[in-house]
């Protein structure tokens, strides 16, 4: 909902009631939002009454949206505001095959909206009307002071209704017009977790269809979750069960394996991501192959043509061009040069319990399997670190460095056996 009205006003007013503190905390730091408290909740008109003292009276129009109708599009909101330049009062309406329970839109012979009639008050002829009110509207700000002051709660629910403003507008000779949304899901409301789940599936399918229309290959468009913005280049392929959060950019020719989770990450062209990978706040250079079961944490940067294999974790580290980290390895707070091979089981020991330290590995270095690099430490260009080494001091360039206990064979030793 807030995404739909982004840019329409410098400051948006959010009316909160139930769990108000939690809602405000969720949007903490948003300088474009202000909050009005509605306690108790006494109808839609009452909600606007609470917002009225903090609304900008200099704005010619006031767009009223509903928090439980989350999928209003920016295009529909824009068309409503454009229509408001011709008609002061604009309703968002929709035609339904079965409008039972909804307020009907009554028009005169010229097609001008004259009233909203609730079903219980409608005549038999009015009940045949299929155009109904969604509750979303654009109102003339200059008239709101008088209209809100005139609202009454003399109904069975003792609530103040925004729909009563239509009658005030008609009495004042204000022209009322209506705009239809492009899609019915834009005005679907949510009153239960069942409805929320159903609408979420609708929205995910809408996003999946947009990707398909743009040329993205989705192995199963019903099994993808986009929880933010996903930007795809040409010839992208996404397997089943993938989740994209925040802003994710996939370059041309990227393939994403099944059940991968990618958050706030940029992936350049021709990258293959094998199944069950997890990326967050990372940057992946072109022609790389990652996974399966790889994790890129915030600050991980792969510069290109990198291999990051199974059960490898990279955090706050730069991996140079053509370097490989293929198996069972942790690279944290490190600068790894170009054409480096990091053997299985290598760990950059970057944390002493209080502080984090960096590891620097020069170009063309070879790190043997099961090496511990005790940071801060540097490995020179072209250096070789023998398997099983615990490196506590800098390793010189172009030389073999290793530390391991001398191998021994104990003559005459026998393995203990259990007593019978």
Regions found by a protein language model. Name each.
Residues 1-82:
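Conserved N-terminal catalytic core of the sugar/cofactor nucleotidyltransferase
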Residues 11, 52-53, 60-62, 76-77, ...:
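Catalytic cores of nucleotide-enabled group-transfer and carboxylate-activating enzymes in metabolic
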Residues 14-15, 63-64, 89-92, 178:
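Structural beta-sheet core signal
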Residues 21, 25, 31, 72-156, ...:
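Conserved core of the sugar-phosphate nucleotidyltransferase
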Residues 51, 68, 80, 105, ...:
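Residue-level signal for inorganic ion chemistry
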Residues 130-233:
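Conserved alpha/beta core of the MobA/IspD/sugar-nucleotide pyrophosphorylase nucleotidyltransferase superfamily
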Residues 223-304:
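Acidic, glycine-rich loop-and-beta core segments that form the ion-binding/anion-interacting portion
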Residues 272-420:
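Glycine-rich hexapeptide-repeat left-handed beta-helix
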């Amino acid at each position: 909902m807030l995404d739909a009205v982004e840019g329409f006003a410098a400051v948006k007013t959010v009316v909160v009631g139930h769990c108000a503190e939690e809602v405000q905390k969720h949007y903490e730091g948003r300088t474009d939002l202000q909050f009005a408290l509605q306690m108790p909740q006494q109808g839609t008109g009452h909600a606007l009454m609470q917002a009225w003292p903090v609304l900008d009276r200099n704005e010619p129009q006031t767009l009223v949206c509903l928090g439980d109708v989350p999928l209003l599009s920016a295009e529909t909101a824009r068309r409503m505001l454009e229509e408001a330049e011709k008609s002061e009062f604009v309703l968002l309406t929709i035609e339904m095959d079965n409008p039972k329970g909804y307020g009907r839109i009554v028009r005169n012979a010229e097609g001008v909206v004259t009233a909203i009639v609730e079903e219980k008050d409608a005549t038999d002829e009015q009940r045949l009307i299929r155009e109904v009110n969604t509750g979303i509207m654009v109102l003339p700000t200059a008239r709101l002071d008088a209209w809100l002051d005139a609202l009454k709660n003399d109904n069975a629910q003792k609530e103040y209704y925004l729909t009563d403003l239509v009658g005030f507008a008609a009495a004042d000779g204000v022209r009322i017009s209506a705009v239809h949304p492009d899609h019915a899901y834009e005005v679907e409301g949510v009153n239960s977790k069942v409805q929320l789940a159903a609408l979420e599936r609708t929205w995910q399918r809408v996003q999946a269809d947009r990707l398909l229309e743009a040329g993205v290959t989705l192995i199963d468009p019903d099994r993808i979750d986009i929880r933010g913005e996903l930007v795809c280049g040409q010839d992208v392929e996404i397997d089943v069960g993938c989740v994209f959060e925040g802003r994710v950019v996939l370059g041309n020719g990227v393939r994403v394996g099944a059940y991968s989770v990618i958050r706030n990450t940029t992936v350049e062209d021709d990258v293959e991501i094998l199944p069950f990978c997890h990326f967050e706040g990372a940057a992946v250079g072109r022609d790389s192959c990652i996974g399966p079961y790889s994790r890129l944490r915030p600050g991980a940067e792969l510069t290109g043509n990198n291999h990051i294999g199974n059960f490898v974790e990279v955090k706050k580290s730069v991996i140079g061009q053509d370097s490989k980290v293929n198996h069972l390895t942790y690279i944290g707070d490190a600068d790894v040069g170009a054409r480096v091979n990091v053997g299985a089981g290598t760990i950059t020991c970057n944390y002493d319990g209080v502080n984090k330290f960096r590891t620097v590995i020069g170009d063309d270095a070879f790190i043997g399997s099961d090496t511990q690099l005790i940071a801060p430490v540097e490995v020179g260009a072209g250096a070789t670190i023998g398997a099983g080494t615990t490196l506590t001091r800098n390793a010189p360039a172009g030389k073999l460095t290793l530390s391991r206990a001398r191998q021994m064979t104990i003559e005459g030793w026998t393995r203990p056996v259990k007593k019978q």
